[in-house]
């Protein structure tokens, strides 16, 4: 749930391992 991935997912996917898309940013936990 924390925006610590430094990645956006405007296309709906996250490339960072362990991160999920919470549009429009990737989050972890």
Curated annotation (Swiss-Prot):
Spell out the SUPFAM superfamilies in the cross-references. Answer: Cyclotides
Please give the positions of the paired cysteines in each disulfide bond: 5-19, 9-21, 14-26
User: What PTMs does it carry?
Assistant: This is a cyclic peptide.
Cross-referenced Pfam families = Cyclotide
State where the record puts the cross-link Cyclopeptide (Gly-Asp): 1-29
**What InterPro entries does the entry give?**
Cyclotide (IPR005535), Cyclotide_moebius_CS (IPR012324), Cyclotide_sf (IPR036146)
Q: Give UniProt keywords alphabetically.
A: Disulfide bond, Plant defense
Q: Which GO terms describe its biological process?
A: defense response
State the protein's purpose.
Probably participates in a plant defense mechanism.
What's the family? Belongs to the cyclotide family. Moebius subfamily.
Q: What is known of its domains?
A: The presence of a 'disulfide through disulfide knot' structurally defines this protein as a knottin.
**Protein name according to UniProt:** Cyclotide mang-A
């Amino acid at each position: 749930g924390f925006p610590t991935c430094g990645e956006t997912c405007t296309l709906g996917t996250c490339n960072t391992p362990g991160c999920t898309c919470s549009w429009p940013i990737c989050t972890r936990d």
